[in-house]
From Swiss-Prot:
Family annotation (InterPro entries): HotDog_dom_sf, PAAI_dom, Thioestr_dom
Assigned protein family: Belongs to the thioesterase PaaI family.
Keywords: Hydrolase
Source organism of the structure: Mycobacterium tuberculosis (strain ATCC 25618 / H37Rv)
UniProt KW Hydrolase keyword: yes
Record protein name field: Putative esterase Rv1847
Pfam families named in the record: 4HBT (PF03061)
Record GO cellular component, one term: cytosol
Broad EC category: hydrolase
UniProt miscellaneous comment: Was identified as a high-confidence drug target.
Length: 140
């Protein structure tokens, strides 16, 4: 899944929200993506565990980047927007690194569906989500 030299979504792309979150992509291509995030105190909720919104944001960002890469490698450009994000929280953690991996479930002309799994330092699943994305035509 390493990006090719002509990848439509290079690893060094800067997305302000992802940067604020601390999300770093390690692999990106039309068939999937991987990213990691260092759990810091500002990402914790009152009880001291990672806020569920962090996982929702990771899942949508990772799925969106992979979907964008696929759309632009199999079409005439364009973009994607999330239309549904269904995230399940499996296990709570309060520190360490988390790793997200996206895999396609459906990639069609109008929509895509991606599954993202987030694991901790010991490879335990901490969250899992599906994101449905709408493919948008390139603007003239």
């Amino acid at each position: 899944m390493q990006p090719s030299p002509d990848s439509p979504a290079p690893l060094n792309v800067t997305v302000p929200f992802d940067s604020e979150l601390g999300l770093q992509f390690t692999e990106l291509g039309p068939d999937g993506a991987r990213a990691q995030l260092d759990v810091r105190p500002k990402l914790l909720q009152l009880t001291g565990v990672v806020h569920g919104g962090v996982y929702c944001a990771m899942i949508e960002s990772i799925a969106s980047m992979a979907a964008f890469a696929w759309l632009n490698s199999h079409g005439e450009g364009g973009s994607v927007v999330g239309v549904n994000n269904n995230t399940d929280f499996v296990r709570s953690i309060s520190s360490g690194m988390v790793y997200g991996t996206a895999e396609p479930l459906h990639r069609g002309r109008r929509q895509q569906l991606w599954l993202v799994t987030i694991t901790d330092d010991t490879d335990r699943v901490v969250a899992r989500g599906q994101v449905r994305l709408q493919n948008l035509e390139a603007r003239p």
